[in-house]
Structure formats: structure tokens, C-alpha cells
């Protein structure tokens, strides 16, 4: 029985992933590459950190020298200029400044920032200086989950913040978008019964993107996958709501495939369309 494999043009759109490496292959650069290629685009990378991790947790993190991160970004833009950029794990303020400097120098567009602060396992992956207002200000959209949005909003408001309802999520998205000057997608996947996300712009426009929650304990790399898929949509010229909606549909398929690997929170099936 033959399998219909989607085709792509000889000169596909490309997406640059600036993120950390995950030795288990489920998140970070590895998840980004799988997502971008599965969606028919060409993946390029700049590695910001090496992590020793598996489905049960993170054992060690080693940040890449900022000069090396900058050199990787320069090398990419000197040849195959990306149509979109996804920024994931930024381990330090120095790396954040290097990324901002080089993306600004190259006039990067369609930047999607996934503010990776804490791994699915609970391990802290970035210091406070890595949350860069300058980087967020360059972004087309920033994609925090609820815990990350609570941290970001707490820093803006200088007090502890909790998101416990859709009204709270909408308020957070609007406040963060206004403060940082870019769109914010607050992801509701941590909810018990649904995966409703809210997208807000600095101008105060709000769009809810609703979906049912997939009952699957294997969620390692969901944030990386969604943000990379959004970048793919933007690279292909979709408007923001359409790019997010398509990305959510792809992620839904990754979860519904129910790949079952590892002894902890396992990885997604990024290739569900092909098998």
C-alpha cells in the first residue's frame, strides 16, 4: 500500500530556529526541525544551548557562547535568508542581546518568540535577564503558556499574578501585548478540559482560538512545536490568526497520534501526516 507524501517546491520557504538542543529529540531545535520539515518548509538553526535531558527531566544545561550564537545567525542570513524566525530557549541575558543585535542587523521578519523558561519536567532553563523587552518588541508574536504568562505579567505588574479564568487570560494577553508592543498568544493547554488560546495585539484586538483538549500525557515539546508551526504559517504569508489556527490543527494531529516513547512525558509524533 502506497502512502501519499506531500510534495514541496524545489525552493521552499525557510524558517530559522534559534533555540536549545534537546538530547531526547522531543523539544527544542529537534522539535523545530521536525515541525518545519513536516510542514514542507526548510529548517535552519542557531543553537543557543546544549541540554542533557530525556522524557523524565533535564540533567544539565550548557549555554552557547554569545559570539557563537551570533556567528550562526550571521552564517544563515549570509546565504539562505529565512522567511521567518522562531526563537526558543535563551539561556542568558548575554545570549538575548546577541540574538537581538543580529536579528536587527539582518532585518529579520516574522519573528515568533516562545519564552521558554521552564521545561515540561519543571527544570528552570533561563535566567531572568533572558526575558528581553527588546527581543519581544521585535516579535510578530510571543507565545507563553499560562505559567509563563503569569511570570511575565508578574514582572510587568511587579506583583504575583494568577490566571485562573478566560477573563484572566484575555487580560494578561492584552496587558502583555500593550507593554511589549507585539502580539501575545496566551496558550490555554494547561487547562483541564480544553485548549483555548487567546491572541491579543498591542492595539487591543482580541481573537480566541478554541480547541478541545487531547487526552495524552505525552506533551514534551508542545510549545516548541506550536511556535515553529506558527512561524511556518507566517513564512508562507498567512495572517496571524490563520497561522495560529493552522498551527493548532497540526499540533492537534501530533497529539492525537499518541506516540508512546519514554518513561516520562514523552515526545509528539511530528510525522503523523506521513504514516
Locate each region found by the language model.
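Short pre-catalytic strand/loop immediately N-terminal to key active-site residues, enriched for Gly-Thr
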Residues: 18-24, 206-221
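Conserved phosphate/ATP/ADP-binding segment of small-molecule kinases
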Residues: 126-206
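Charged C-terminal helix
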Residues: 241-275
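Phosphate-handling active-site elements
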Residues: 39-44, 206-207, 233-247
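Acidic-glycine-rich active-site phosphate/pyrophosphate-binding loop
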Residues: 2-11, 28, 193-209
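Short, small-residue alpha-helix embedded
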Residues: 30, 35, 150-151, 216-240
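Nucleotide and nucleotide-moiety/phosphate-recognizing core
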Residues: 68, 94-109, 132, 182, ...
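Conserved N-terminal subdomain of the carbohydrate kinase-like
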Residues: 2-17, 31-120, 125
